[in-house]
Amino acid sequence: MSSPAPKSPELSDKSKKYDRQIRLWGEHGQTLLEAATVCLVNVTAVGCETAKGLVLPGIGGFTVADGSTVKEEDLGNNFFLDSSYLGKSKALACMQLLQELNPDVNGDYVDESADFLLANRPNFFDSFDLVIASNLNEQTLLLLAERLWELNVPLIYCRSLGMLGTIRLQIREHCIVEAHPDNRQFDLRLEHPFDALREHLDGTEVTSKVPWLLVLHKYLNVWQKQQADGTQTPRNYKEKNQLKETIREEMKADEENYEEAIKAVNTAFGAGQVPKSLKAIFEDDACEQLNKKSNVFWIMAKALKHFVIHENEGHLPLPGVLPDMTANTDSYIALQHIYRQQALQDADQVYHKCQEYLKQLALPADSIDERSVRLICKEAAGLAVIRGTRIAEEYEKSSRLLPLVEDNELQGNLTAYNFALRAYERFLSECGNIPGECIVEQDIGRLKSIAAKMLSDLGMHATISDDVLHEICRYGGAELHAVSAFIGGCAAQEVIKIITKQYKPIDNTFIYNAITTESVTLKL
């Protein structure tokens, strides 16, 4: 009687609950998410949808700040509110309804407006990892953005008006360790094998049962001897075809590992070099000049640079990851073990250099752990740093804005709508009411004047077309929940990228037109 198959380890309740998202950003990403707290400024449909996209995956906590009460018009704009909350605190209603989605998340609320908090409780925003805001007038937006820039707290500002929506990310510096590139190349180090790999490759007989890596190594050696100029790896289409033919000539029928080796010729070489993006990080002043306030990312980056230049002949640490290969289990596991051991050895050298730097800076040794170093070594080729701009810079003269103007008129393109929404916010500040809420024709004229002055102040010799401004007034400040749901979902995704330090966030503005289903990302 055969023995029963071993059981898979039991998943915890949390792992079962968040299984799909953990597949995207891992247990370590989930841990960062559950440790984060965010603030939602203003209860709007787009704000609630953004918060929903964070509460469902298990954000650590959220606080809602809004000084208004629920009115009849809110019920039509925001599906999160119902008639039972009429006349009650909008912040409380939002907090309670969001918490129902995930009782594991801590919720809080403050019955105060952003203006009041900035004027009377300026330290209110200090403790948050990120702030999400919507439906602010220009003056309040700029005050909030400047305060958060000083605190180095990221801000996601969302707009949803009629069929239009935008997201603006303000972040001082964002260091990305796990960028999750679409086309990741496996670093196999065939052209520069380390000692343990060379011994294994040279000492193993090539049969139909071994991984294709051994097949490719064997016939790469044959091909190298045929090169009069001493070329070590195929550099172009012709040379790659020569190597493929060398393998094909020795292949017997139905040898899958030989077929895989032939296919791998195109992608098996060239990894392990320092890409331009990483060179820029190595040459950055933040990497060159460490101090006690340096982000641990920069300390690890400098240790990584030292390893590459002084200890690894210009090559990156080995990630230690192999692609799937047709082979018997023992031979594949043996090869996998060699790569993993070398990856651990490389990471250990980088870790010890990190500890040296921490000691020099008089920082605690536990500021950087081995797991973090192993991760940055594994992902070294994809490291990225984004340095954002202040929202206030958009309201100052900037050459960055000039290329957005075509033929001296901002027509019905997405850039025009972005400027029109900014004119809408200035209208709120100067006039104290929503354009189009009461006397539409009168408000259109005022909005035109505000838009013209705004563009003139920016040094832009352009106008926003009447059709665009008419459309803004026609919306009368109304949110369409379907548009808000889309913008909120996108914004929540950006928040998660920032908190988990995975995937590249927008840099820095996303604009969406639901009428034409067009979208664009701009750096403003």
UniProtKB/Swiss-Prot annotation:
Which GO annotations describe the biological process of this protein?
Answer: protein neddylation
SUPFAM superfamilies per the record?
Answer: Activating enzymes of the ubiquitin-like proteins (SSF69572)
Null-mutant phenotype, please?
A: Hinders tissue development, causes apoptosis in imaginal disk cells, and blocks the Nedd8 conjugation pathway.
What GO CC terms are in its UniProt record? Answer: NAE1-UBA3 complex
MF (Gene Ontology):
amyloid-beta binding; NEDD8 activating enzyme activity; protein heterodimerization activity
Which Pfam family, any one of them, does this sequence belong to? ThiF
Annotated metabolic or biological route of this protein: Protein modification; protein neddylation
* Keyword match Manganese: no
Subunit structure as annotated in this protein's UniProt entry: Heterodimer of Uba3 and APP-BP1. The complex binds Nedd8 and UbcE2M. Interacts with Appl (via the intracellular domain, ICD).
Could you tell me which PANTHER family the record lists for this protein?
NEDD8-ACTIVATING ENZYME E1 REGULATORY SUBUNIT, UBIQUITIN-ACTIVATING ENZYME E1
- Name assigned to this protein: Nedd8-activating enzyme E1 regulatory subunit
Organism field: Drosophila melanogaster (Fruit fly)
Encoding gene (name): APP-BP1
